[in-house]
Amino acid sequence: IDRFDESAILIGGRRNERLVGSLRILCREPEEEWEHDRFWSWRDEFPPRRSTVDVSRLCLEWDERRIQSVVCLLRAVGYVMLELRRRFILACCTDELVGMYSTFLGARFTGDVILHEDLGAKPHRMFFVDLDQILGGRGPSLLGWLEHVRLLRRVLCATMKSEFGMRYRTVLCSYLLRAQQRG
């Protein structure tokens, strides 16, 4: 827990009523401090801050570390980004996860490596993901993930703080219900 949690959108994944994974979305104004600002500088060639969310603290229980669990959490990120009208994800990962994020999300790595003391001693690589490319069929297919909404509904539990958070909990539930009714 840190100073960013108060304004964060927290996403949790459950299996059989047990929390097995979580992540955090920060939707900040360009002039506000972002979590990753402490470790590197935003450059002109990066996507605009106004169009980006900062996703961090993705954590899964050891026995849940499989692609289905990650996909369920990232589906929720996609839903939130659509509601927020943000196109890009800014995130970081260890070397072991570079292939997964490249393959399944079309992650574009910046070449920057940071040491984030809150995330342990391993170096983390910074990357962006373009949701518009995924939804537009010009990258990995998020639509394939969205076909599994029943699984998502069972596994996903959005846990958010404050009045701001309650609004987005309702948004996530609304997306899930609408998708289920169409499916």
Question: Residues of each region from the PLM?
Answer:
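Acyl-donor binding region in acyl/amide transferases
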Residues: 33-133
